[in-house]
Amino acid sequence: MYDLHSILIQLKKEDTPLHGVMVRCVRCFYQWLDPTLWEGSALFELWAQELELIYGDLRQRLSPNAKTDAGSLGDRFGFDTPPELPRLLQSIQTFYSVLIKLIAWNTLRGATPEPPLTELLSGRAFVNRGIRNFCGDDWYIWPLDIWDPALETQCEELRACLEAFDTCPEGSTLSPDSLSRIYETVVPPALRHALGEYYTPGWLAERTLQNAVSASRQQAGDLRFLDPACGSGVFLIQALRMIRADTPQGPPLSDQVAGFDLHPLAVLTAKVNYLAVMARQPLPEAGLFLPIYRYDALNIPILRGDTLVIDTGCGLVCDVPLSLCRQAVEMRPDPEEFLSMPEARGLLTSLPPNGRLLLAGILLNRIWAFFHQKADIVMGNPPWVNWEYLSPRYRAGSQHLWGEYGLLQVKGPRLGFSKED
């Protein structure tokens, strides 16, 4: 198993082999994310829509007025001229996605031969090991659509470099903070803080859950937990550990702990943390389905008769027959299987094949989360984002909640903190 502490140290130090590999990967990805290759494509427009949903006005948040210095960020990755920040962000996040999948495979590979890198990055290698809903088509597997020799070389260099860190004995415990710290190292603080990204320390999640379980007057092993804004999964991991401590021989833990998040990288990180806990014991013969979903808990699907109206968050709203939703919940298909179902063949037909698979994955996650069983304890550290940084579309879609829950009852001096709308 990889020594994540040593990985973290090398990523921070500029004169180390791993830091050099990171810089070369990010620059290579940046080169291939040339807007002339992508702008105008349906997939690019969908990505831009979701980016706005997650971060609001990205150009405003990454502007000099927001104290984000493109020059100093470019220096870190060896750029001669200041890079375009949204493009740099996508390059950095793509690198993190590749890194985290390599770490995930290392936690469970055992005696299994190393799969081709294309199978690992696409998620097929994990499906072949019986692990479902880990990863698939997302905004960060775009290199597979090109798979130029330069891209392949950089990704293989990263995999080879990580082998030097495979020093921890089998069964070692993965700290729930480790992956968050790696993300915080890969994505420079200036970018993270401009985007409002902060993570909850493990000790705080543990203390919070202990208090919640104590107040419930039940054992953790008898409860179901949900984190509707799970981030990197720190609350999920603490809940899994509490359940296992209470019921060492109990039912599969994945039936009891679930998480939602809007950010695809947060979801991926949470799944790696979740998988690391589950992989410490033999996986069920039927395989393992990871109940962590790309889902916006404030923008839930709407039931209209026999149809579930789902906002994908990418500018597309889909009317999905309720009967198809029930099949998806029962069968848990992958995106390709889902689109082959008779009732799904008319969905997303305006998109290119890779776009259809990506959006089908988003639809499935919305469906699975919407029909997920009720929880006894809702846990987590809710995201905090300034109102003016939310996209206009998100403000309009969620504004009714503030009145319904009495959140606009502000009087006196506190009116100075209110916004124009």
Q: Can you say where each PLM-predicted feature lies in the sequence?
A:
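N-terminal secretory/membrane-targeting helices
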Residues: 1, 138-146, 315, 323
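Intrinsically disordered, low-complexity terminal regions enriched in charged/polar residues
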Residues: 1-41
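Solvent-exposed, charged interface segments at domain starts and junctions
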Residues: 23-34, 46, 90-93, 300-319
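Short linear interaction motifs
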Residues: 73-89, 354-365
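SAM-dependent methyltransferase catalytic region
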Residues: 170, 178, 184, 188-421
